[in-house]
Amino acid sequence: MTEVPPIPVLHLEGGWQVAVEDWKRCSGRLRLRDGGVDAGVHVERCAAGRLRDAYPVGARDVEVQVTDAVADEALTALLRELAEAVQRADPECRRVVYAAPEGDADQVAAAECAGFRRVVDVDLADRQLSLLVVEPDWVTRTDIDLDHVPET
């Protein structure tokens, strides 16, 4: 079993005020404020959290959960900033994951506007979720030369 690295400390840009409510090795709770937005956020290594058995998680994958109701435009801005903050704090993170309730078209659309891509619907013990991810270019980049074997 691969050891799960600690969750990185996130530094948000763009005027967000951040208050740490709780921080542990693999998860943390933040209170974020910007203008009229006041939102609770939970960040967690997927391999140590509720999604650990939901898909083939990477040790460095991070789930971001917005725990308070936020308007769609504000949710988009918040998710975009959280994804960027995770990628700045942990350049080896392969996936930033946002789990929307399955069938919630508004949350899925807000996440997609923030740069997330819908990848799979999963069933947890108590709910069904649509997983959306942001992945860095080094994960999604492909070599279109099919005759070339990488690193040869």
Located regions from the model:
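Conserved catalytic-core motifs of GNAT/GCN5-like acyltransferases
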Residues: 117-131
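Conserved acetyl-CoA binding element of GNAT-fold acetyltransferases
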Residues: 52-70, 130-132
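Conserved acetyl-CoA-binding loop-helix of GNAT-fold acetyltransferases
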Residues: 72-87, 113
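Conserved beta-strand-loop-alpha-helix junction that forms the acyl-donor binding cleft
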Residues: 96-107, 124-126
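Conserved GNAT acetyl-CoA-binding A-motif
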Residues: 86-100
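Conserved active-site tyrosine of GNAT-family acetyltransferases
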Residues: 110-111, 116
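Actinobacteria-biased recognition of intrinsically disordered, low-complexity terminal regions
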Residues: 1-38, 46-49, 56, 140-152
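Short, cationic-aromatic polyanion-contact patches
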Residues: 132-138
